[in-house]
Amino acid sequence: YYLRSLADGTLGYSYKKSAAVALLIRERLGYTLQITIPAVLLSAALGLSWGLVCGYRKNSMGDRLSTGSLIVLNAVPTFVIGLVLMLVFCFQSRLLPYAGLSSSGIVKGSPGYTLDRLRHLALPVLTLTLAALPNRYLLVRNMAAQETDEKYILYAKQRGLSGRTIRWSYLLRNIAQPFVNMLGMSVSVCVGGSVVIERIFSIGGMGSLLTEAVYTLDYPLMQGILFVTTCIMVLSILLCDLICVLIDPKRRREGAK
């Protein structure tokens, strides 16, 4: 029965909610992706640029402060980050809303709808970005710090090239593949991390749906969510492998042969 439901695309039937599993997931998946995709891109951009600078200037005061701070941040649970941000930006400064994805009275398609949605997404995206940033930064920083002792980097410095040129034209080439591979593996972690974030900020995404399925022992729904999450992880890893082929001349030549 389950294989037949996979073949016809329904992913089973949820008797607790009286609906096809695929329909329930389709309604919620978009909300989770609105949080996960910006967080993955932001944490990747920040981790890459910040890690390159600190790795190139290893053992400097800025490197020590940045690395120490992010090691501490890496030990902080995601829900603590979310609660602290909520306390600061929602209850003290009242700059951002603390729950949901839209304000009451805002109709989809109205002039203020997009801005209202962005304001509601700001804190969940920032929370997931801060939770994912330390791993990206530490990977890039450590690889860049090791590469700075290589002969080609020393030769580039002797030629009088600027630090910016060395970082983005030399260091980046050698750390790009491990970094891209790590991003592929971390997409599923971010999707899993959205479970906590969606509960904190009252967002009805995949994480909330999975929590409801666990509480009600809705096994078909749990199976469907895990299946979709696994497919997302596999597709992200495949996409990252294709990107690695494009950025690595050696692998491109091997593929051509």
Enumerate the predicted regions with their spans.
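Phosphate-coordinating loops and pocket residues in cytosolic domains that bind phosphorylated ligands
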Residues: 26, 67, 98, 168
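Alpha-helical transmembrane segments of integral membrane proteins
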Residues: 29-62, 108-257
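An internal, D/E-rich "acidic patch" concept
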Residues: 1-48
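Short capping/connector residues at structural and topological boundaries
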Residues: 16-20, 100-101, 106, 158, ...
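A general structural signal marking secondary-structure boundaries and capping sites
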Residues: 10, 92-93, 217, 250
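Residue-level signature of catalytic and energy-coupling elements of molecular machines
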Residues: 3, 77, 241
